[in-house]
Amino acid sequence: NIVLVLCGGSPVELPFAGAMSAIVHGYLPGQGGGQAIVDVLTGAHNPSGKLAETYPLHYRDVPSAGQFTRHEATAEHRDSIYLGYRYYDKVAAPVRYEFGYGLSYTTFAYGDLAVSTGGAEEICSATVTVTNTGDRAGAEVVQIYTQAHDGTGFRAVRELAGFAKVNLAPGESCAVTVPLREHAFSLFDPEAQDWRVQPGRY
């Protein structure tokens, strides 16, 4: 079995990913990173991290690939609001690993999703029941995305609106609530120089 350990701060091309038994991403771990990675590899620690970027299938799929070369010291920001996963959603490009992806030594199941009106500080909240269906204790990150189904506005296909992490023993279930505040539904209005919530279905 071959396990690939990545240490870096940005996505890389992984054409050989299918030949790996597993991939562990250490990001930029610092002086304690070696021991932390050993703990994950030996099973002393159950990983629960999620990717902070989208991993493309090919380098040519990266939006800056066409105007960034090894001979240039800078690259122009041409992505508009479509940064990171928003770009891949917009162009419907297949990717190797999605933003927010991550595995564990246990498994989780979701159910009973419900959305309720919010209180003083949020527009609404999303509640979902998460169950640890494996045989090891572990942690899961619940991610809630918003998507506008109608209305006008220059916006991404979907956006991460909130998240929450829960630790569960084997067989344990927990209702996880993620508050969705006004900013999760807002667009910036250049005329008003302020954030505005567009009417419509989300």
Regions found by a protein language model. Name each.
Residues T152-P190:
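Intrinsically disordered, low-complexity Pro/Gly/Ser/Thr-rich segments with frequent PxxP/GP/PP motifs
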Residues A137-I144, A156, F188-E191:
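Short, hydrophobic/aromatic beta-strand segments
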Residues V5-A139, Y145, H149, P170, ...:
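Secreted, periplasmic, or luminal enzymes acting at the cell surface/secretory milieu
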Residues Q193-R201:
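A glycine-anchored, Pro-Gly-centered beta-turn/N-cap motif
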